[in-house]
């Protein structure tokens, strides 16, 4: 095989030129710089430069800021008008945006850390609104969950899974993280969750985001949490925790209806339930049951069935509708797989919680911008809107390109027959 070398400067990541153009045309640089404190005259790079450089690392196939230095930097610096900071500057800029952690002590005397970054949280929603991914005249479904992020940092702690790390609480709308608070790895999911949700709902109201429905697992099944959720949305759906009182009521149910949910048949029923005492407010408990696999009798229900309950204030919808709606939260849980493996949540760069919180929110913005890009390209039939970032890179980003000068004009030359010039037109 004969080989010849060429010194011609070809950028193998030509698609990033079009991503940068969208970034500028949408006004994201000015939004970012306006929303965050200025870096001052002594800094060569603005936060908008730092943000897009970090995002570009993911869009080009990297997973950390150091990839800018070792793999992509020279190619990115060849793009006219793109100021590309080094990895050190990118990381230093994120550290500047860190907020002070809050320390609380539980009734059992255990200290918990929580990191609330209001400027970054507000910017996340502003970016999503700017992209058209969130709108003021829509009632959204909110999913809330905690995600264990395994890591060994100075302030990471052992979780209940016996894995060291952080345990952030994350609000999700339409497959996007929209609010993030970082927490100690050992913190119980219910510990001060009502305060986290109250802050999230307050921020949503300030940004004009309406929450119509809330959907949560049994980690949100407590009186304080339910009161906060009910006060801030129209209807909620929370997985109920079984207890002796609930099982007593289930035994009294005589009318069950057989319904096909997904690919399986279940028996379903609804009852009025007072989870916090007969003198408190009653809710609707939607129950499903199915035979267990081993046929073993349950001591309390006196049958060989598996029971599951959903607590809700929705008295109008059919049981099947409520169950299918709740089961759809599995799609929201897949968001964590995407954030972990495509946008760096499984590789936290800093040694302190507050700095890693900035990173989590910044990469959530990166994910939101990516969602905007692929949905727009999907309308031009480049690919499906739900593709993972690896296919996006292969299908759009990795194309040979070169900036040339003709008639005193800079022209981007693409070595492909694909109509890149029409991609976002």
Region spans (language model):
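Anion-binding and metal-coordination hotspots
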Residues: 1-10, 30-425
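Conserved oxyanion/phosphate-binding beta-strand-loop segments in alpha/beta enzyme cores
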Residues: 10-31
């Amino acid at each position: 095989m004969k080989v010849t070398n060429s010194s011609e400067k070809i950028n193998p990541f030509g698609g990033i030129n079009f991503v940068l153009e969208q970034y500028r045309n949408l006004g994201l640089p000015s939004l970012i710089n306006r929303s965050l404190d200025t870096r001052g005259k002594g800094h060569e790079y603005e936060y908008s430069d730092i943000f897009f450089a970090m995002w570009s690392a993911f869009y080009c196939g990297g997973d950390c800021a150091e990839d800018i230095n070792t793999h992509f930097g020279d190619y990115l610096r060849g793009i006219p008008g793109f100021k590309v900071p080094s990895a050190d500057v990118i990381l230093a800029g994120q550290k500047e945006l860190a907020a002070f952690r809050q320390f609380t002590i539980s009734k059992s005397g255990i200290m918990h850390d929580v990191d609330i970054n209001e400027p970054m949280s507000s910017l996340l929603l502003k970016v999503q609104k700017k992209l058209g991914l969130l709108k003021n005249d829509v009632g959204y479904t909110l999913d809330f969950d905690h995600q264990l992020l395994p890591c060994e940092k100075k302030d990471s702690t052992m979780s209940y899974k016996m894995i060291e790390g952080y345990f952030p609480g994350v609000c999700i709308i339409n497959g996007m993280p929209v609010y993030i608070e970082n927490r100690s790895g050992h913190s119980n999911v219910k510990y001060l969750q009502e305060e986290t949700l109250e802050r999230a709902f307050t921020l949503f109201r300030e940004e004009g985001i309406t929450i119509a429905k809330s959907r949560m697992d049994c980690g949100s099944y407590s009186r304080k949490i339910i009161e906060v959720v009910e006060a801030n949305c129209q209807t909620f759906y929370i997985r109920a925790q079984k207890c002796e009182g609930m099982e007593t009521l289930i035994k009294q149910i005589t009318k069950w209806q057989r319904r096909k949910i997904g690919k399986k048949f279940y028996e379903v029923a609804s009852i009025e339930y007072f989870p916090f005492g007969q003198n408190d407010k009653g809710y609707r408990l939607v129950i499903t049951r199915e035979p267990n696999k081993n046929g073993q009798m349950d001591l309390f229900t006196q049958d060989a069935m598996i029971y599951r309950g959903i607590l809700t204030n929705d008295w109008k919808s059919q049981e099947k509708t409520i169950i299918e709606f709740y089961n759809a939260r599995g799609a929201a849980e897949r968001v964590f797989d995407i954030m972990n493996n495509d946008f760096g949540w499984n590789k936290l760069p800093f040694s302190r919680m507050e700095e890693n919180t900035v990173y989590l929110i910044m990469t959530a913005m990166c994910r939101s911008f990516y969602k905007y890009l692929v949905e727009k390209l999907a309308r031009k039939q480049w690919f499906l809107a739900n593709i993972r970032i690896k296919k996006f890179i292969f299908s759009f980003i990795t194309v040979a390109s070169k900036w040339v000068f003709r008639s005193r004009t800079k022209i981007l030359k693409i070595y492909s027959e694909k109509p890149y010039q029409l991609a976002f037109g």
